Amino acid sequence: MIAGNITPKEVYPMREYVIMTDSCCDLTDHMAKELELAVVPLTVHIDGHDYPNLLDGSAISFEDFYGKIRGGVLATTAAANVGQFQEAMRPILAAGKDIVSINFSSALSTTYQSACIAAQDMK
């Protein structure tokens, strides 16, 4: 599940919590759906364009992405921001569920900090 596409009725009726992560989780879209994870996408900057890093490759195909990399184009990422985490958290909390958030390393990205700020703001 991608942030923003979750409605309260889809929020895991048999669990008291939802596991949230970001798109650096190194899971396939199929795995994330099977595990019922809420996934917040980071942004990939490549060849002058910004793309959400969606696990299903729908924003930029894996073939296009790796083709550009092989062609020498530099790719960088931008952390998920507080608003993206709040958007993902809102329907989960509205359904009365707790959130366990497992994010990209705070030593490498501000994604973890964004998740923490969003959680504090949503209390």
Task: Label each region the model flagged.
Residues 81-92, 115-118:
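Short, charged beta->alpha transition segments
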Residues 104-122:
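Short Gly/Thr/Asp-enriched flexible loops that form oxyanion-binding sites at enzyme active sites
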Residues 23, 103-104:
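Small/polar loops that bind or transfer phosphate-bearing groups
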Residues 18-79, 84:
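N-terminal glycine-rich anion-binding loop in soluble enzyme alpha/beta folds
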Residues 1-13:
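Short, Lys/Arg-enriched N-terminal segments with co-localized hydrophobic residues
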Residues 91-99:
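Glycine-rich phosphate-binding loop signature in dinucleotide/nucleotide-binding domains
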Residues 33, 93, 120:
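Anion (oxyanion) recognition and catalysis
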Residues 79-86, 104-110:
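N-terminal glycine-rich "phosphate-gripper" loop used for MgATP/nucleotide binding
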